[in-house]
């Protein structure tokens, strides 16, 4: 699990990130990125899977867990904790990502981050 300081929590933070509209897409994962106004705030991340993707919460939550874990592992591998970029990121899972394995989702997350 990501430490609390690295998570987007409020609806206003999610909306502000969506408004900036810097985005990239790969394999059923879309990434929206925004720049934080305050420079003392580290990069914060949120994960979203809407009811349009699947009506069952179990499926949506599983996809969110896979997205979270793949992002966390990429941070650990690349030693990006405490990076000097002041971003807010929102990963949005789509229907295409539902049946994929962890490795496929991890590659999709990696590609979206590289495109950014």
What name fits each language-model region?
Residues 1-116:
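Positively charged, solvent-exposed patches that mediate nucleic-acid binding
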